Amino acid sequence: MDAIKKKMLMLKNDKENALDRAEQAEQAMKDAQEKNVKLEDEINDLNKKIRMVEDELDKAQESLKEATEQLEAATKKAADAEAEVASLNRRIQLVEEELDRAQERLNSTVEKLTDSEKAADESERARKVLENRQGADEDKMELLDMQLREAKMIAEEADRKYEEVARKLVITEGDLERAEERADLAETKARELEDELKTTTGQLKSMEAQATKASEKEEAYEEQVRDLSAKLKEAETRAEFAERTVAKLEKNVDDLEDALYAEKEKYRGVSEELDQALNELHNM
């Protein structure tokens, strides 16, 4: 009888111990599952952060590309404007040289015309002197008449040359006016190009500043990417460690489940033995 009671007490203790171990195994399994869920959430958060950084890096690279294209376009436009200004300056210089040559020709023509007028005046004075000399011989008179005709011819030639010079002067003045108009237009165009060049230069400086900022921003992004890459590597290491830990925990859970199953089997066996002992006790 004492042996049966002692055996029943042992079976009861074994049953309680089995229940405690089963509860501990279930709690350990729950803790392992919660830890596994937490690690999976951390890995998902890291993946989201990595995708966000990659998107920001793509946007920064696109902005840098656009700024570089605008800078190249502005540089080409400035170079074209400088070339056009240089061409206009050369044309203005050629017009000024042509104007100087026309002025020289005009001065030479006016000087020749002045000489012709002086010769005509001298011939007229000589003719008057000859007319006053009533007693001069006929040969001298004929000579003077011939000189007078020559003087008239010279005067007519001078008048013709004067008209020709005047006509050329009018043409030259027209050419000069047109040249001055072209020069004014060229100066206006040059001023417009200078203003446009200043504006373009300002835009170029602004774009260079933007490109510098974009470069700095890109460097900052690259630094962030390096940091995030390091963090990603660390996270991957942690994830690998977590995966190994999860695998280990899953193995522990499996072991605990096996132990729980064994304890349940043991509990069932103890219960059966206890029931059998109770039946034997009742039969006695």
Curated annotation (Swiss-Prot):
<dbReference type="InterPro" id="IPR000533">
    <property type="entry name" value="Tropomyosin"/>
</dbReference>
<feature type="region of interest" description="Disordered">
    <location>
        <begin position="186"/>
        <end position="221"/>
    </location>
</feature>
<comment type="function">
    <text>Tropomyosin, in association with the troponin complex, plays a central role in the calcium dependent regulation of muscle contraction.</text>
</comment>
<feature type="region of interest" description="Disordered">
    <location>
        <begin position="106"/>
        <end position="134"/>
    </location>
</feature>
<protein>
    <recommendedName>
        <fullName>Tropomyosin</fullName>
    </recommendedName>
</protein>
<feature type="compositionally biased region" description="Basic and acidic residues">
    <location>
        <begin position="112"/>
        <end position="134"/>
    </location>
</feature>
<dbReference type="Pfam" id="PF00261">
    <property type="entry name" value="Tropomyosin"/>
</dbReference>
<comment type="similarity">
    <text>Belongs to the tropomyosin family.</text>
</comment>
<keyword id="KW-0175">Coiled coil</keyword>
<comment type="subunit">
    <text>Homodimer.</text>
</comment>
<keyword id="KW-0677">Repeat</keyword>
<feature type="coiled-coil region">
    <location>
        <begin position="1"/>
        <end position="284"/>
    </location>
</feature>
<feature type="compositionally biased region" description="Basic and acidic residues">
    <location>
        <begin position="186"/>
        <end position="198"/>
    </location>
</feature>
